[in-house]
Amino acid sequence: MRLACAAVISPANAPMHVASFPSSSPSSVAATGTDDARLLHHRAVDDAHLRLAHAALDEIEARLRAPPATASAAGAAASGGGPKDPYLGEVHRDEGHVVYAHVGATAARFVLVMATEEEEDDDDASGAAGGTREETLRGMFRALSEAYADAVSDPFHAPGGKIASEAFARRVRALADAA
């Protein structure tokens, strides 16, 4: 799986930072190969990733508002940590992407949209390799949470506003490069 999009959503469900990492393969770009076509393609991909992250917010809200017993039963398989685990696991899936979520101590939502490989089947996603994937995702969320904490601790950051820090953007980009 490849990181396609990373988003930080405020407790009020406003996007604080959204970074999309479209595939750079030549087959994913319009056949004309012009810069305009490439730009339009990447903008459409960015919008698709944003829609996926937005669609996942309903499930995130449902899990956060669920009573502890229900949240534990519903999310135990995905998160493995019970109702107080900030890692929510898989919250949305479509034919080419899986969306994972984590909720920070400040109620900020961290969303990772992972592009699935066509040859990958569901057994690999939840089987023996699932533990490794789970650890990798938790590590990515930990790194994203640390970058977020550093960014919002900046005295020039407006509370609840968009994260404009270049250092934060670089750290998010490093997550995509490492995935």
Could you say what each language-model-derived stretch is?
Residues 2-4, 18-179:
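Acidic, low-complexity cytosolic segments
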Residues 9-10:
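Short, acidic, Ser/Thr-enriched surface-loop or helix-capping motifs
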